[in-house]
């Protein structure tokens, strides 16, 4: 029950950014272009290791990703088992992979491209702010402040985060 509410809250946040943020066309067009780039360059992107250590992205991202999943690997199987009662193993595997991938892509496309639009088109220099020693969380708030009723978006995000954690840890 709470998992279903989480899904609605998550999509409400995405729709808030997509339709109320004023960058709908940019988000959709850039999203399709990025999916095309992913399909076109998938092999190269998935095997990129930065052997000359020119930028360290591959190594830093791997460390971050592994640390992230080490934190969640304990709770995730219980959560998936809790929401998968009565389903076949095939449905659980494909559902977890498919819906997880779709949710991740949607959130990266909508939230990422909204922030990119603010950086590129509207002068919200979040990248420069972080590069000059600013806190990442403050940069996120700078982007939220460009939305109509930013306090409502933050409240919706906070409620969604609490619901997601509650659902995951309840399993």
Can you describe what each PLM-predicted range is?
Residues 1, 24, 159-169:
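Helix-loop-helix module between adjacent transmembrane segments
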Residues 1-87, 94, 99-154:
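Membrane-embedded translocation segments of transport machinery
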Residues 139, 157-158, 171:
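Short amphipathic alpha-helical segments
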């Amino acid at each position: 029950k709470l998992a279903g509410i989480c899904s609605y809250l998550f999509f409400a946040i995405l729709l808030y950014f997509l339709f109320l943020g004023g960058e709908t066309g940019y988000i959709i067009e850039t999203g399709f272009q990025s999916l095309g780039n992913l399909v076109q360059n998938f092999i190269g992107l998935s095997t990129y290791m930065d052997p000359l250590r020119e930028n360290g992205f591959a190594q830093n991202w791997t460390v971050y990703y592994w640390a992230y999943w080490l934190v969640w690997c304990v709770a995730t199987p219980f959560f998936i088992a809790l929401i998968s009662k009565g389903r076949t193993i095939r449905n659980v595997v494909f559902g977890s992979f498919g819906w997880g991938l779709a949710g991740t892509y949607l959130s990266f496309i909508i939230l990422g491209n909204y922030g990119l639009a603010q950086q590129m088109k509207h002068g919200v220099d979040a990248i420069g702010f972080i590069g000059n020693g600013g806190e990442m969380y403050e940069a996120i708030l700078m982007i939220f402040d460009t939305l109509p009723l930013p306090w409502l978006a933050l409240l919706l995000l906070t409620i969604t985060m609490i619901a997601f954690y509650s659902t995951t840890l309840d399993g």
